[in-house]
Swiss-Prot record:
Domain notes: The reactive center loop (RCL) extends out from the body of the protein and directs binding to the target protease. The protease cleaves the serpin at the reactive site within the RCL, establishing a covalent linkage between the carboxyl group of the serpin reactive site and the serine hydroxyl of the protease. The resulting inactive serpin-protease complex is highly stable.
Record-annotated site: Reactive bond: R357, S358
GO cellular component entries: extracellular space
Protein name per UniProt: Serpin-ZXA
Source species of the chain: Oryza sativa subsp. japonica (Rice)
Region (RCL): 343-367
GO molecular function, one term: serine-type endopeptidase inhibitor activity
PROSITE patterns: SERPIN
The protein's role, per its UniProt record: Probable serine protease inhibitor.
Length: 396
C-alpha cells in the first residue's frame, strides 16, 4: 500500500476516533451515558470531503485540515476515490461481506451545479446528483432522499431526514449511506446462547442474551483492557473485515477508554490481536443499534465551523450568484449495527513473530459490562463503524 495512502488512512482514523470520543462522552446530548451509539466515521469523512470539493478559500482549507491533516483538498479527493474502490466495493458475489455505499447531492433547482464539482462528485465519489424543488415541495424532497437511502441500505435505514429537517429555505442536502453485512468466519452456536447478567454504568444490571463458544479466539489482554477480534468471511479479494470489541477491565471504564483512543490514534493499531488463544469463559452479548444524529454541532466542536456559517465559501459547487450565500445547514447521519450468532449487519448513512511457549493459559473474555466496538478493514486499517454498548437490551 502506498505511503501517502497510509498517511491519509491514519488521518481518517484519528478523525474517526475524535468523533467517537466526542459522541461517547457522557456529556454529549446525542450519545452520552444512556444510549448505545453507532456511527460510520468513514461515511461522514467521505460526505465532508465532497463538501470540500465544492468549497473555496478558508472553508476548503478548514475542511482539508480537519479531515486530512496538512495537505490539499485534491489529496482528499484522491483518497476518497481509493476508498470507494478499495474498501467500499461489494464482495458478496464471492462470499465476502455485502457492502453498499451511496453518496447523494440534492440541490435546489434554482441553482445549477458547477461542471467541475459534478465531475468530481460523480467521477471520484460515485455520487448521484439530483436537482430538486425545496422551495415549493420540501416535504416531497425529504421523502425522495429517505427512499433513496432506504434502497441503498436494503431497508435498514428508512429515514435519514427527520420531519421538518428541510424547508423552503434549504438549498442543498448531502446524504450518504453505508450498508455492511458480514458473516463471522466462525459462527456462534445459537443453542449455546444463554441469558446472563450485564452490568450497567449506573450500578444496576439487566438479564441479556450472551453468545458463548469454546473455540480459540483472537484475544489480547492488558492490565485494564481486553481486545477481541472477530474476523468476517472473506470474498475473493485481499480485503479482510473484522469487528473489534474493546472491553475495559473496570465496569465503568468506558469513558476513559474512549478518551484514551482519542488521545492516541495509533492505540488501536498497537493493540490488535494477531494470534488465536484457548478460551476459558467466553461471553459476548447480542446487540442491535440504530443511531441517528445531526452532526453539525459535533463537527463545530471539533473546529469545523466555516462550512456551517454564513461565511461559508461554497462557490465551487454552484454556478449562480446565490452560491455566495450557500452554506451547509445540517449533516444528518444514521447508522445501524446488529451483532448476532451469524455475524453483523450494519448500515450507515505485520509480520507475525512466532514464539514457543509453555502450555497456554486459557483466556477469559466476559463482556458483561459496557464496551466499545469498531469494524475495520484490516489490510488498509480503514475504520467503517465505531460505537459503544451501554445496555444490550436497548431496542434499536
Amino acid at each position: 500500500m502506498a505511503a501517502d495512502l497510509r498517511v491519509s488512512i491514519a488521518h481518517q482514523t484519528s478523525f474517526a476516533l475524535r468523533l467517537a470520543a466526542a459522541l461517547s462522552s457522557p456529556a454529549h446530548p446525542a450519545g452520552g451515558a444512556g444510549r448505545n451509539v453507532a456511527f460510520s466515521p468513514l461515511s461522514l469523512h467521505v460526505a465532508l470531503s465532497l463538501v470540500a470539493a465544492g468549497a473555496g478559500g478558508a472553508t476548503r482549507d478548514q475542511l482539508a485540515s480537519a479531515l486530512g491533516g496538512p495537505g490539499s483538498a485534491e489529496g482528499l479527493h484522491a483518497f476518497a476515490e481509493q476508498l470507494v474502490q478499495l474498501v467500499l466495493a461489494d464482495a458478496s458475489g464471492a462470499g465476502g461481506p455485502r457492502v453498499a455505499f451511496a453518496d447523494g447531492v440534492f440541490v435546489d433547482a434554482s441553482l445549477s451545479l458547477k461542471k467541475t464539482f459534478g465531475d468530481v462528485a460523480v467521477g471520484k465519489y460515485k455520487a448521484e446528483t439530483h436537482s430538486v424543488d425545496f422551495q415549493t415541495k420540501a416535504a416531497e424532497v425529504a421523502s425522495q432522499v429517505n427512499s433513496w437511502v432506504e434502497k441503498v441500505t436494503s431497508g435498514l435505514i428508512k429515514e435519514i431526514l427527520p420531519p421538518g429537517s428541510v424547508d423552503h429555505t434549504t438549498r442543498l442536502v448531502l446524504g450518504n449511506a453505508l450498508y455492511f453485512k458480514g458473516a463471522w468466519t466462525e459462527k456462534f452456536d445459537a443453542s449455546k446462547t444463554k441469558d446472563g447478567e450485564f452490568h450497567l454504568l449506573d450500578g444496576k444490571s439487566v438479564q441479556a442474551p450472551f453468545m458463548s463458544t469454546s473455540k480459540k479466539q483472537y484475544i489480547l489482554s492488558y492490565d485494564n483492557l481486553k481486545v477481541l477480534k472477530l474476523p468476517y468471511q472473506q470474498g475473493g479479494d485481499k480485503r479482510q473485515f473484522s469487528m473489534y470489541i474493546l472491553l475495559p477491565e473496570a465496569q465503568d471504564g468506558l469513558w476513559s477508554l474512549a478518551e484514551k483512543l482519542n488521545s492516541e490514534p495509533e492505540f488501536l493499531e498497537k493493540h490488535i490481536p494477531t494470534r488465536q488463544v484457548t478460551v476459558g469463559q467466553f461471553k459476548l452479548p447480542k446487540f442491535k443499534i440504530s443511531f441517528g444524529f445531526e452532526a453539525s454541532d459535533l463537527l463545530k466542536s471539533l473546529g469545523l465551523h466555516l462550512p456551517f456559517s454564513s461565511e461559508a465559501d461554497l462557490t465551487e459547487m454552484v454556478d449562480s450568484p446565490e452560491g455566495k450565500n450557500l452554506f451547509v445547514s445540517s449533516v444528518f447521519h444514521k447508522s445501524f449495527v446488529e451483532v448476532n450468532e451469524e455475524g453483523t449487519e450494519a448500515a450507515a448513512a505485520t509480520a507475525a513473530v512466532i514464539t514457543l511457549r509453555s502450555a497456554p493459559i486459557a483466556e477469559d473474555f466476559v463482556a458483561d459490562h459496557p464496551f466499545l466496538f469498531l469494524i475495520q478493514e484490516d489490510m488498509t486499517g480503514v475504520v467503517l463503524f465505531v460505537g459503544h454498548v451501554v445496555n444490550p437490551l436497548l431496542a434499536a
